[in-house]
Amino acid sequence: MNINRHDFYERYQKGELKIALIGMSNVGKSYTATRLAEHYEFSLIEVDKLIRTDMGHESMKDFAEWQGQPFTNGYAEREEISIEKETIATKSAISSKKSNTLIDTTGSVIYVKEDVLEELVNNFYVVYIQVHEDHIERLKNDYFSNPKPLIWNNHYRKINTKSPIESLFACYPELLEARRKAYENIADKIISSSKILDKKTDINELFKLLQPAD
């Protein structure tokens, strides 16, 4: 949704501002969303939680274990189910009538059904939190130390000289690059994760970072 700074403030004052945060898992979306909800009274909707509730998973770890890795049996079918569930959850979040809605999307929001993604883009101010190059290694490590379900969308391939896990690490930058392009295509605003995660960035500065340039 293309809006200027005046529209941004006016919608916020009326309780009609709609923001969607997009980007990779562990890049700082939930951290940002929680801070904004606490200090600026946004109505936060966490799509991950909607999906977990629908599927009966108690934690993100349970969800990740159910989905598995792209080299495990049945992954393709479970990946398809995940996208279907995410489409339903994202549609539900978009339909919210709450004041100043803030959607914390999943990293795979770009794979939901086209009509739902289009509805999100047309009705929400989309903020993309882009992975700073200094954070890429941390994201890879977080993926294994703090598992989250990840849609690989055919970007994983087994490398002959590497184990399946080593192949995941090797293919991760390719997945990041493919997603970067997809995120940028739907973003109204791009913010570096270096700004989002910087402890010196206070909540007021964070709110300003979100706003349109003009």
Give the positions of each predicted feature.
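NTP-dependent small-molecule kinase module
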Residues: 1-16, 35, 39, 100, ...
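Hydrophobic anchor at the beta1->P-loop junction of P-loop NTPases
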Residues: 21
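Walker A (P-loop) phosphate-binding loop of P-loop NTPases
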Residues: 26
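Walker A/P-loop
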Residues: 30
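Post-Walker A helix-loop "phosphate-sensing" segment adjacent to the P-loop in P-loop NTPases
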Residues: 38-47
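ATP-dependent small-molecule kinase phosphotransfer cores
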Residues: 50-118
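Short glycine-rich anion-binding loops that position phosphate/pyrophosphate groups of nucleotides
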Residues: 106-110, 132-134, 196
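A glycine- and Lys/Arg-enriched "phosphate-lid" helix/loop adjacent to the NTP-binding pocket
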Residues: 122-178
